[in-house]
Amino acid sequence: WKAAKPGEPMWDSPWGKGRPGWHTECSAMVHRYLGTPIDIHGGGQDLQFPHHENEYAQAMCCWHEPLANVWMHSGMLLINGEKMSKSLGNFYTLKEVLDKYPADAVRLLMLQTHYRSPLDFSFDRLDGAVGTLERVRGAVANLRWAAESSSASGHELNDADRAFGKAVDDAAAEFTRQMDDDFNTAGALAALFGLVTASNTYLDEAGANVAGSVALRASD
């Protein structure tokens, strides 16, 4: 409960005129408009204490149940190794970035870092994300072209085809395993990038003898 200040909304209470503090505001809004417990409560690591801890305590005291089933705290955003700050002159808005780069590249840059780790943003890294996207899309396009153009689509799978098919299955399983491990998007992308490398190698070595069904499965 915050004591009243001139010009602010205020209500009477046993503790004097004032208004709910930030922690109480959030707990009350979640309970009234979303219902408790909510599935996921997110926020930056700087909110873990005292804000989220107080939200949790208030919910347990008022409604005898947690405010959320899962709490996810993201790492801080850094700019070239320094905390993003207007005072340092290293502040970028999302609109400024999207005026120069595609949204998919921004998403990829974020996904390459685990959500609980600090994200070091730089335009060099964003340029790298653009190149990575082109590499992934190129591999998918090559796989689909090879699948459609293959003259060996009905042939019996050979050792190279089976090995590549296993690489596809292993990559899919590893992707899922990493995502199930605290939403480890960085590890999941590593599995995807490994499959891109395996795809390019397979297409180079198979030439015209690509197994269309395997190539199409990999592209999906």
Report each predicted region and the residues it spans.
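Structural preference for alpha-helix termini/caps and helix-kink/transition segments
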Residues: 83-85, 90-220
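Alpha-helical recognition segments enriched in aromatics with Gly/Pro capping
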Residues: 1-146
